[in-house]
Design a protein with these regions (language model features):
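Acidic/polar helix N-cap motif
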Residues: 23, 262, 272-273
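A charged, aromatic-enriched C-terminal amphipathic alpha-helix characteristic of glycosyltransferases
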Residues: 271-306, 311
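Short, contiguous hydrophobic alpha-helices characteristic of membrane insertion segments
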Residues: 238, 254-259, 304-312
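CheY-like receiver
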Residues: 59, 198, 266-270, 304
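Residue-level signal for the nucleotide or nucleotide-sugar donor/cofactor binding architecture
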Residues: 226, 258-261, 292
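Short beta-strand/loop segments at the ligand-binding rim of alpha/beta enzyme cores
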Residues: 83-90
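Nucleotide-sugar donor-binding catalytic core of glycosyltransferases
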Residues: 1-63, 67-78, 90-252, 297, ...
Length: 312
């Protein structure tokens, strides 16, 4: 009998977003089955991070698709791994989590795994050639992002948000560069909607991967993040560097290579020649609309599962 795959709804953190929820919602929209709510999950959240119980048995009729992070693998899959075959889909499974993840896959007899990092998928494919290991590129909800203004009509020259501020200090920019920073409490970038609106009115932002801004965590892993899709969809110039897996996936480099020795002069030069970048950002938006949505990834995941003999 084919096992029916049911997805588990990710935990909803109080006063915080969970990006994995968007993937589960797309699964549900196309008719994918889901499990019920986890009873009392807020009470066992802390404990399940640190305790890895054995699999008691595996249900012969159902498998569970669980959306996981390397740091929260045990919680993201609890209590499902006790009684079901788990099919994990991983984000942020950095090398420091590989040892724990390898042991967990063996311990719970996991047969099928998805990773958003191609390098991480390659690593586990070499470890487990007999198991089903797949790379599913990062994606986003493309319909949320807008591109209503041409670059010349935007009022924010440089939008600063996220970890990239560790690389570039906007406080040292020329006063002619109009900066909006998420680190300024008065900027009004308190919500995701605020960020989406700011992106659509910005000309330039920095786009780098964790390999650039936190190499001690990345440890050589260079992977696509939602930041690239956000900026491409919003028609913003990505000043930085693209991971090779993004270049391979879309067929070109969507960024303007950053000169870390003189970012200030580079931004001024881009401002003075802003209309020459319109063609690139238009191409980036169309590419992101065509290739960057979670709907496409869920379609791919469903096909893989059916090809492997699971039932939906």
């Amino acid at each position: 009998m084919q096992k029916i795959v049911k997805a588990k709804k990710p935990f909803i953190y109080p006063n915080n977003s969970n990006f994995k929820l968007a993937v589960w919602e797309e699964w549900a929209k196309v008719g994918g089955q889901s499990t019920g709510e986890r009873p009392l999950e807020k009470f066992y959240e802390s404990l399940s991070y640190h305790v890895d119980l054995p699999t008691l048995w595996q249900n012969k009729k159902e498998a569970r698709l669980c959306f996981c992070e390397g740091a929260s693998l045990r919680f993201d899959t609890f209590p499902d791994y006790l009684t079901h075959e788990v099919i994990p889909m991983f984000w942020d499974c950095w090398p420091k989590y590989w040892g724990v993840t390898e042991k967990w896959i063996k311990k719970h007899n996991v047969r099928t795994v998805f990773f958003t990092s191609s390098q991480t998928a390659d690593h586990f494919r070499q470890l487990f050639p007999e198991r089903n290991i797949f790379h599913i590129p990062e994606a986003i909800e493309t319909e949320l992002y807008k591109d209503e203004k041409k670059l010349r009509d935007r009022t924010i020259d440089y939008l600063e948000f996220g970890r990239c501020s560790r690389i570039v200090d906007s406080s040292k920019f020329d006063s002619s560069i109009r900066v909006l920073s998420s680190f300024n409490e008065k900027s009004g970038l308190a919500t995701r909607t605020d960020l989406i609106n700011a992106l659509s009115n910005s000309k330039i932002t920095i786009a780098l991967t964790r390999l650039d801004n936190q190499p001690e965590i990345a440890e050589g892993i260079d992977t696509l993040t939602q930041r690239y899709w956000e900026c491409m969809l919003s028609g913003v110039i990505l000043l930085g560097r693209a991971p090779q897996e993004l270049i391979d996936f879309i067929g070109y480099d969507p960024t303007v290579q950053i000169n870390l020795q003189d970012v200030n002069s580079q931004i001024i030069h881009i401002k003075e020649n802003i209309e020459s970048y319109q063609e690139l950002v238009d191409k980036n938006r169309q590419t992101a609309l065509q290739l960057g949505d979670w709907k496409l990834r869920i379609k791919e995941i469903r096909k893989i599962l059916l090809d492997l003999g699971y039932s939906l």
